[in-house]
Amino acid sequence: MLMFLAGKAATDELSGDISIQVPVNMRKFYPSETVRNFSMYCGIRIPITEINDAPSMIDEINTQLHKKASKEAMIEMLTSTEKMVNMLKYVPLAVKQPVAKVIYGFLGDKIFTNTLSNLGVVEMPSSISKHIESMDFILGTAITNRAGCSVVTFDNITTFSIAKMTVDPSFEEKMYDLLQADGVEVIVEGSENYEN
């Protein structure tokens, strides 16, 4: 919800949608022993004109999350992906690569404004946790997404990380203001701008 408000504050657009890509842990539907990532994504989309205050958006976000992250929706997406992979496995790589580049260039990560990934509460054995000051994880930056945000909580400290390709600080500043307004004690750490 705060990301929608910060996203609106960070854009000059007056129309269109803010869309946040949220990973869904597929292990809750298909138990797996692997430590490899097993997730799919759903998109929570709200028109910019409807992003006004937190209470008015909570019901809409919950409704979309419930519908789009449901087992039925994830199975449908997984089945579609599997069918596409099975169909494309017979197409030569020399044909697939240029087509994939064109499709990614046309859509790519432009269909989402931001990404949010939450590892949740991480617990460690006391023999290890006493040596850990804090914990974080950072998503890689995307070519066009405004920001990739990640959250992890360890030892009652929640770390919210933002990775992005732009130097415009309006998204982070709005997130800071919103958290402060909610009475959350915020400590900000950052890295210097990296220019290639």
Where are these regions (language model features)?
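Acyl-thioester-dependent acyl-group transfer interface
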Residues: 8-196
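Membrane-embedded hairpin module used as a gating/binding unit in multi-pass transport
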Residues: 4-5
